[in-house]
Amino acid sequence: ELAPSDDALALIQGLGAAVPMVLFSIPIGILVDRRNRVRLTIGLALLWTLGTLLTAFAPSAGLLTAARMLVGIGSTGSLTAALSLCADFCAPEQRGRAMLIVNLGKALGVALGFALTGWLFGLLTDFSAPGWLAGLAPWRGAHVLLAAISALCLLPLLFLREPERREVEASPDAPFRIVAAELWARRSFLGPLFAGQVAVVMADVAATVWVAPVLSRDFGLQPQQFAGWVGALMFGTGVVGAVLGGISADMGQKSRRRGGILLGAVIAAGIGVPAALFPLMPSVTGLAVALGVMSMCGAVTGLVVSVALTVLLPNELRGLCIGAFIAIAGLIGFGLAPWVVTRVSALMGGEAMLAEALALVGVIVSGLSFFAFLLAMRRAPEPVR
């Protein structure tokens, strides 16, 4: 069939995720602030369903990349819409727990995506496909079935009604110059908040990309010896971190302390600094514990920041800011962090110093995130009423 090389597969997956994240997150965020979010979510869901179906019938690597981009646009944009909708379906003091549901759904979807696709692929490989899938390679047939399942999952959205927008300072139809002025007025808070979360994403992405080479080179493990438990560790600690983040955000609001909603992010970022030393642990067990703590802390900060944006910003800024977070974190975190580790490794003596370079970069960016979140907490505005 297509028989793409590893480089081609990396390009397809990378472009499919990065291009939508960087180019479309902000425009979709603006639409979230100004248009009917339920209809927008349905449209984005249809887009990712169409992309999944086109993946099954793509005749070339170029069209396969385009199909994966459609999936990326739909899935990335729908997260922004879901967070905005979730904020208006509940009171501010409940948003930590409400956002937790969205994040758990996202984590479960990613896990099911791997598990269900693998199961369908195995099923179509071991047994004869039904007539309407006959002649398709197993991976293509699996994507046809995934598209059908996705279409069925969209049906409940047809019964969802657009909620009234809460905490509005300017009309959703206000000129963009007014929205820009509102953003500028909050720059002293949003700047460090953006910097803190981008630094967390850099640390998490670098760890995710380079933990496998560290386990192979420094501990002599083969991929089949660690792939399963690393994946389970990242998923499990991500879920635990999301739960802790949601609870801490709601508790922080009740504290009446300025920026109390961000206290959980400050604490998690501080714990993440020593946890970033995981590549230097003397044993695999020690590495796993430190990596799990780091992953959990990243999940805490991610959820706390999402809640803070929906509580401390007026409704007409939320989609734009969430979209900007996704775009900037995607560009810097996914595009820059792995490369920075390789450059530092080269300066320290080459590939043999990968673990040391990863630890150094992780500690530095984790430290930056701690101070950035602390500054954002001190500059946090009052919740919008």
Model-derived features: where do they sit?
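Helix-breaking motifs and short loop linkers at transmembrane-helix boundaries and internal kinks
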Residues: 3, 36, 57-63, 74, ...
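Central cavity-lining transmembrane alpha-helices of secondary-active solute carriers
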Residues: 12-29, 232-245
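Conserved MFS/SLC helix-loop-helix module at the cytosolic interface between two early adjacent transmembrane helices
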Residues: 23-61
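Structural signature of the two symmetry-related core transmembrane helices
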Residues: 39-54, 259-276
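Cytoplasmic helix-loop-helix junction between adjacent transmembrane helices
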Residues: 67-106
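Helix-loop-helix hairpin linking two adjacent transmembrane segments in secondary transporters
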Residues: 102-158
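Juxtamembrane intracellular "pre-TM" segments in multi-pass secondary transporters
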Residues: 162-194, 218
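Extracytoplasmic gate region of multi-pass secondary transporters
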Residues: 186-243, 298, 302, 306, ...
